[in-house]
Curated annotation (Swiss-Prot):
Positions of Mg(2+) binding: 240, 242
Keywords noted in UniProt: ATP-binding, Cytoplasm, Developmental protein, Differentiation, Magnesium, Manganese, Metal-binding, mRNA processing, Nucleotide-binding, Oogenesis, Transferase
Stated name of the protein: Poly(A) RNA polymerase GLD2-A
Record CDD domains: NT_PAP_TUTase
Function: Cytoplasmic poly(A) RNA polymerase that adds successive AMP monomers to the 3'-end of specific RNAs, forming a poly(A) tail. In contrast to the canonical nuclear poly(A) RNA polymerase, it only adds poly(A) to selected cytoplasmic mRNAs during oocyte maturation. Plays a central role during oocyte maturation by mediating polyadenylation of dormant mRNAs, which contain 5'AAUAAA-3' sequence in their 3'UTR. In immature oocytes, polyadenylation of poly(A) tails is counteracted by the ribonuclease parn.
MF-aspect GO terms: ATP binding; metal ion binding; poly(A) RNA polymerase activity
Ranges of residues in domain PAP-associated: 409-462
Stretches assigned to coiled coil: none
Subunit structure: Component of a complex at least composed of cpeb1, cpsf1, tent2/gld2, pabpc1/ePAB, parn and sympk. Following oocyte maturation, parn is expelled from the complex. Interacts with rbfox2 and sympk.
Matches recorded under InterPro entries: MTPAP-like_central (IPR054708), NT_sf (IPR043519), PAP_assoc (IPR002058)
Organism: Xenopus laevis
Stated family: Belongs to the DNA polymerase type-B-like family. GLD2 subfamily.
Entry superkingdom: Eukaryota
Location of the region described as Disordered in the Swiss-Prot/TrEMBL record: 88-107
Length: 509
């Protein structure tokens, strides 16, 4: 468990909104639109001093100089187990200075997190009225803080069970479709073995909560969000966890501000957090800090203020639970692509995010669509001007989509493979989930001379920009063609994947 944590022996859970409001003090009286400016030079200096203060205190405690400790008010969860995790000459610390080939750009680590690339335009804050009390809670599984909180440490309340308090589970229909043929049943069986369990996300969120407590000692008004596949409904038991640290709602310069902040966090993690290992600071187009949590065993990637990742997490989450066939189909396709070596953006193939968008696009473009375009049907729920503290709440009341298309899972998998093997025009079309159809390519630099074009639903960038080599594109197309032929002939999932071995591995976790 985490040293000296107040959550020892229990899961940290959100406060009920009424109690949380009482604990938040003066902040409830402030207008939500007053976005805090946290990035002045004075605040960077103060953040560095905060780190130094806690580091000095830790060293004195470790050396036994208890009587010389200055009278610093320390929160009850201050960590006392401070062992450095990497040495200055270790691969982890020297990795950040490795030079990349000029033709490589930042593909290796940038495209892996391309879903977190923020739009260039600023988010508009039009919310002039304070939020209702029941809307001032954080995202699923997070300690519930108001957006503008007081500097005092958050108060956690012990709960016996979180199933009734956690937003993450209180409105989701997880009913699975009925399988009436062998292939569809195989897909369902594999999906049930692959899908992320409640215990998996709890472990990730415990670490997120601990990290947030530490980070708020440097940036008191910051918020740390779990995003990506861990939260969007398409995660597996072995999915990495993505974290987004939000300091302000406006876009942030990733080369200056975000890099500075991540440098401070890297120092904080290095000097104070003994439960973190394999710490790396990756200086890419979208810089991240990578690390592993010893307690849960989960791998984390932390970025700063790439808020589009929060928005698309909840867009994809809404699609995931809109129709019961979506999640099983997506998870099996992701597993197939990973098994055949075409699901790794750092190696010039497709990111998991791109694969999900491809599946959603296919389901939108059937003669009788299984999915609509949510951004066209419910534009107010996915408005880019919406404040971040409302993003998770807006789509909650979208009803399930009732499609007249009753195609079984097995036929949908076969149809997906056929669509991208022989029907989709890679050279002329752009995949657009936002529009719910394929768009003709323009002469814009984003699409010119690109092998695969998949539009990011919020910022309009190409999520498949990692595929920049003809050889990798040909390999991807060949895998689609080979899989379509094998499944068409055998109607057996074993022709695509070693299902038994995968299920056995998942069950052993």
């Amino acid at each position: 468990m985490y040293p000296n944590s107040p959550s020892l022996g229990r899961i940290p859970l959100p406060l009920p909104c009424e109690q949380q409001q009482q604990a938040s003090g003066y902040s409830d009286k402030l207008p939500v639109s007053a976005a805090p400016e946290l990035l002045s030079p004075e605040q960077f200096i103060q953040a560095s001093l905060n780190i130094q203060k806690h580091a000095n205190l830790s060293r004195m405690l470790m050396n036994g100089n208890v009587l010389t400790v200055p009278p610093v008010s320390s929160p009850p969860w201050a960590y006392l187990n401070h062992s450095p995790l990497i040495s200055p000459g270790s691969p982890s610390s020297s990795f950040q200075n490795r030079k990349r080939r000029s033709d490589e750009g930042n593909v290796s680590y940038d495209v892996k997190r391309q879903r977190f690339h923020s739009p260039q335009e600023q988010t508009v804050n039009h919310q002039a009225v304070p939020l209702r009390g029941d809307l001032r809670c954080s995202y699923p599984g997070s300690p519930a803080f108001p957006l503008l909180q007081s500097p005092s440490p958050p108060v956690l309340k012990e709960h016996v069970s979180n199933s009734g308090d956690c937003w993450l589970y209180d409105h989701i229909d997880t009913t699975l479709p009925v399988a009436e043929d062998k292939l569809s049943q195989q897909i369902l069986d594999l999906f049930q073995a692959l899908q992320q369990q409640v215990c998996d996300i709890k472990k990730k969120d415990i670490c997120r909560a601990e990290l947030q407590r530490e980070i708020q000692q440097i940036f008191p008004q910051s918020r740390l969000y779990l995003v990506g596949s861990s939260l969007n409904g398409f995660g597996t038991r072995i999915s990495d966890a993505d974290l987004c640290l939000v300091l302000k709602e406006e876009p942030m310069n990733q080369h200056t501000e975000a890099t500075q902040i991540l440098g401070l966090l890297h120092k904080l993690f290095y000097t104070r957090l003994s439960y973190i290992e394999r710490l790396q600071f990756i200086r890419a187009k979208v810089p991240i800090v990578k690390f592993r949590d010893k307690v849960s065993g989960a791998e984390f990637d932390l970025n700063v203020n790439n808020v589009v990742g929060i928005r698309n997490t909840f867009l994809l989450r809404t699609y995931a639970y809109l129709e019961s066939r979506v999640r099983p189909l997506v998870l099996v396709i992701k597993k197939w692509a990973n098994h055949h070596g075409i699901n790794d953006a750092s190696r010039g193939t497709l990111s998991s995010y791109t694969l999900v968008l491809m599946v959603l696009h296919y389901l939108q473009t059937l003669p009788e669509p299984i999915l609509p375009s949510l951004q066209k049907k419910y534009p107010e729920c996915f408005d880019l001007s919406m404040q971040l503290n409302l993003v998770h709440h807006a789509p909650r009341n979208i009803p399930p989509y009732l499609s007249k298309n009753e195609t079984p899972l097995g036929d949908l998998l076969l149809g997906f493979l056929k669509y991208f093997a022989v029907e989709f025009d890679w050279s002329k079309d752009i995949i657009s989930v936002r529009e719910g159809k394929a768009l003709p390519r323009s002469d814009d630099y984003l699409w010119r001379n690109k092998y695969i074009c998949v539009e990011e639903p919020f910022d309009g960038t190409n999520t498949a920009r990692a595929v920049y080599e003809r050889q990798k594109f040909d390999m991807i197309r060949a895998e689609f063609l080979k899989a379509w032929g094998a499944l068409r002939d055998d109607r057996d999932l074993y022709s695509l994947l070693p299902v038994t071995a995968i299920v056995k591995k998942m069950n052993s976790l």
